[in-house]
């Protein structure tokens, strides 16, 4: 119903009731009806204005494509997933036959070297310029806690082709022991994993290494617990 129709109906009702009303009681009834009619007309007019100017009502529909995402990382990952599968990639694992040191190996079942990445001098050599995801995980294991503080470090370093200086790009340190195990107490085993990862702009010829400070604590019990890799984006 439009606002004009509502006003017309109210006026007709006022005329009918005015004819039937008489005396003081009728005057009071007419006054109440007039006040009610005024409020009704004012409310209807306000509602019409709000609807007309779009203050209330259905919201504007979003564009068919949804909100635009302009994050550089999102765009990079999206374009990378749509590209061909000739991107450089490497995933090397720890050599379980080299106790006392962390040696990377690319010949195990779950290792991967593709599209130009090389493993030289225990370092991954980048074959092309671009953005790369660099990641690594190590797992430490021990029995009891010594009297001296025990700190475990895991560091990923880069030697850029443009400046032959070793620079740490990812680093973490953990301490599995908060106090010494008493001589009379049972030495309980502990485990301490460290995972690191990040996206970096690399150049062709850059060398990447993943190292730890205490290789004697490395846990080789399960395959795939200690690894290092890069993925071109």
From Swiss-Prot:
Cytoplasmic side of membrane: 1-33
Disulphide bonds in the chain: 145-177
Site, Cleavage: residue positions: 34-35, 39-40, 49-52, 77-78
BP GO annotations: extrinsic apoptotic signaling pathway via death domain receptors; immune response; necroptotic signaling pathway; negative regulation of protein-containing complex disassembly; positive regulation of apoptotic process; positive regulation of canonical NF-kappaB signal transduction; positive regulation of extrinsic apoptotic signaling pathway; positive regulation of JUN kinase activity
Domain named THD: residues: 88-233
Modification after translation, per record: The soluble form derives from the membrane form by proteolytic processing. The membrane-bound form is further proteolytically processed by SPPL2A or SPPL2B through regulated intramembrane proteolysis producing TNF intracellular domains (ICD1 and ICD2) released in the cytosol and TNF C-domain 1 and C-domain 2 secreted into the extracellular space.
Residues bearing a lipid moiety (N6-myristoyl lysine): 20
PROSITE patterns: THD_1, THD_2
Positions bearing Phosphoserine: 2
Bilayer topology term: Single-pass type II membrane protein
Alphabetized UniProt keyword annotations: Cell membrane, Cytokine, Disulfide bond, Glycoprotein, Lipoprotein, Membrane, Myristate, Phosphoprotein, Secreted, Signal-anchor, Transmembrane, Transmembrane helix
All ranges on the Extracellular side of the membrane: 57-233
Gene3D superfamilies referenced in this protein's UniProt entry, alphabetically: 2.60.120.40
Entry's transmembrane regions: 34-56
Any one GO MF annotation of this record: tumor necrosis factor receptor binding
Residues annotated as glycosylated: 80
A Gene Ontology term for the protein's cellular component: extracellular space
Record carries keyword tRNA processing: no
Source domain of life: Eukaryota
Binding partners and assembly: Homotrimer. Interacts with SPPL2B.
Similarity comment: Belongs to the tumor necrosis factor family.
Chain's role: Cytokine that binds to TNFRSF1A/TNFR1 and TNFRSF1B/TNFBR. It is mainly secreted by macrophages and can induce cell death of certain tumor cell lines. It is potent pyrogen causing fever by direct action or by stimulation of interleukin-1 secretion and is implicated in the induction of cachexia, Under certain conditions it can stimulate cell proliferation and induce cell differentiation. Induces insulin resistance in adipocytes via inhibition of insulin-induced IRS1 tyrosine phosphorylation and insulin-induced glucose uptake.
Protein name per UniProt: Tumor necrosis factor
Gene responsible for this protein: TNF
């Amino acid at each position: 119903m439009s606002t004009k129709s509502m006003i017309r109906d109210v006026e007709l009702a006022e005329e009918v009731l005015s004819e039937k009303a008489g005396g003081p009681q009728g005057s009071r009834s007419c006054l109440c009806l007039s006040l009610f009619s005024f409020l009704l007309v004012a409310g209807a007019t306000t509602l019409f204005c709000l609807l007309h100017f779009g203050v209330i009502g259905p919201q504007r529909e979003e564009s068919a494509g949804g909100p635009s995402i302009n994050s550089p990382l999102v765009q990079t990952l999206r374009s990378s997933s749509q590209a061909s599968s000739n991107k450089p990639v490497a995933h090397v694992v720890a050599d379980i036959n080299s106790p006392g040191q962390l040696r990377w190996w690319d010949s195990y079942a779950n290792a991967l070297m593709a599209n130009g990445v090389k493993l030289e001098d225990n370092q991954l050599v980048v074959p092309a310029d671009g953005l790369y995801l660099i990641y690594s995980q190590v797992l430490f294991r021990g029995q009891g806690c010594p009297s001296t503080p025990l700190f475990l470090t895991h560091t990923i370093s880069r030697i850029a082709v443009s400046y032959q200086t070793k620079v740490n790009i990812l680093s973490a340190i953990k301490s599995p022991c908060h106090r010494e195990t008493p001589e009379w107490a049972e030495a309980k085993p502990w485990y301490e994993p460290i995972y690191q990862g990040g996206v970096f702009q690399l150049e062709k010829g850059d060398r990447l290494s993943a190292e730890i400070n205490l290789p004697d604590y490395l846990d080789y019990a399960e395959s795939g617990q200690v690894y290092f890799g890069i993925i071109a984006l």
